[in-house]
Amino acid sequence: MTSAAQSNPPLTRSVDELWLDVLQQISARTAHELKGALNGVAVNLEVVRSRSSRSDAAAASVASFASSAADQLDAVVGMSEALLTLARAPRDPLEIGETMHCFASLLSPSASADGGSLRIEGASREVVSGAVRASGNVVRLVLGAALLAALARKGDIRWKVDVGQEIVVHIESADAEGPLEVSSEVSAAADAAGIRVHGEGQSMSLTFPRAATTSARTRTHERA
């Protein structure tokens, strides 16, 4: 069992430095999948262009390639938008739901490529929106580090959020190999920001203080 409430060593790197390290790891996982999707778009569009140039070309002969190109382009746009959002300075207070979906957009493809999955549980089309009192990069750091720790197991990862007086993110790995935990530096940063990190077995809970001025709400998420 691990907990940020336990004594942690003082930070040797700033929160921004720690977050940059986590973002680089996320980008490295995403790069291969993003390049693959871009190559897929290019290949399928070239097939469409080549076949469409024939005088006897039928629409049916290019339809499947055009559809594949559109699907891959959607994936490219989703990953690119998520990466740009996380690369920009956060707006405080940070919306937990938007941040979770940015991570999911970036990390789900690589999880699938590794033979696992990453899914936000609950109603699959709902995003729980709640603003967190801790600074944006601390929230990103703790969420990102916890997800990377879970994804290192190369299994099925499920996470969900409960919003009450506090915002609690639950991450669970189907892999039973060792406890799920983050580094002592991340734990120390979380502790200093009032974020509680509790790991037990294959699960971890991250408890964030709510921003006093923003209430939780649920909105429909348009993506499957």
Describe the residue ranges of each PLM region.
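Histidine phosphotransfer helical core of two-component systems
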Residues: 2-26, 34-74, 131
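Conserved ATP-binding N-box helix of the HATPase_c
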Residues: 21-43, 131-157, 182-192
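Conserved catalytic submotifs in the C-terminal HATPase_c
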Residues: 117-133, 164
